[in-house]
Amino acid sequence: MITLNTLKDSTRKRKPRKRVGRGIGSKHGKTCGRGEKGAGARSGYKRRLGKEGGQMPLFMKLPLRGFSNAQFRRQFDVINLDQIEAVFKDGETVDELSLRERGFISGRTHGIKLLGNGDLTKKVKIHVHAISESAREKLTQAKVSFEIVK
């Protein structure tokens, strides 16, 4: 006869953890399911992703395709016109050194690019590595001298 206290949960939500190294009667004693010797028996061993046990791995069978120019792209630290307006005074020079002193650039890039966000009314001298079209238009309208350095 089946009673409520004798029912077993056939689909456990949490399986009991596998206790290894607890004697030969448990099926996971001595070598703990790792086999005898070799890398798999040692601690710290992890199978490499895509390893296929002697067979040529799939990623090596497939041909190389395409080309990515990402490793050659030029990355710039960017600064906007409104940032120059807020920090620099009339007659000052905006260059890599002055921007680094004020904490605007990190230095792990190919230079500085000036973007056209905001307006510039102060007469400053600008020496940067690249300028966007909108920034170039605003600088010529404001009659601010700028130079693109290499």
Curated annotation (Swiss-Prot):
GO terms for cellular component: large ribosomal subunit. Gene3D superfamilies: 3.100.10.10. Keywords: Ribonucleoprotein, Ribosomal protein, RNA-binding, rRNA-binding. Pfam families: Ribosomal_L27A. GO terms for molecular function: rRNA binding; structural constituent of ribosome. Residues 11-31 have a biased composition (Basic residues). Residues 1-52 are annotated as: Disordered. It comes from the Bacteria. Transmembrane segments: none annotated. GO terms for biological process: translation. Binds to the 23S rRNA. Belongs to the universal ribosomal protein uL15 family. Part of the 50S ribosomal subunit. NCBIfam families: rplO_bact. This is Large ribosomal subunit protein uL15. It comes from Protochlamydia amoebophila (strain UWE25). The lineage of its organism: Bacteria, Pseudomonadati, Chlamydiota, Chlamydiia, Parachlamydiales.
